[in-house]
C-alpha cells in the first residue's frame, strides 16, 4: 500500500529532524577553534560544549518522551522543534563561555526529545510494511546533516554579505530554520 501525502510529510519531517541534529553537531565541531579564540580559552575547554550537549540528551529524551506519551507526539514535537531552534540560535548571542555552555546544555535537552518523538511519530504514522525502509531513510538524515554542515560552513563561514562577515555566531543562526516552517 503506497503512503499518503500526510505519511510522506511525516517521513520527511522525521528525516529532517535527524539531519538538522547532525547539522548542528557538525557546525559546533567546525567552529570550536573560533569559539575558543573568542572566549579566550583552549579548544579542549570549549569542546566541553559537545559533552554537555550530548549528556543532556538523556534528560530531554525522558522529559519529552513522557510529555509525548501524555499529550500526544505531534504537539510536543512542535514544542520541541521550536525549543531546540530557539536555543540553538541563542548560542549565537552568548556573551560568555558560561552562557554558551548553559545554552548548549539546554539545547541538548531539547534535541534529546527530537529523536524519540520524531522516530516514534514516524513509525506510528506509516504502513507496517514500510517501517524497515523508512527507518533507513530516517538514519540517512545523519550523514545528510553532516554533508549540509560541511557545505554551509564551506560556503558561508568567513564570507562577507552586506558588510557583515559571517563567523561562528552566524553558523548557529541556521538553527532557526526548523522553527521557521
Residue ranges and their predicted role:
Residues 1-181:
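Transmembrane-helix signature of 12-pass secondary carriers
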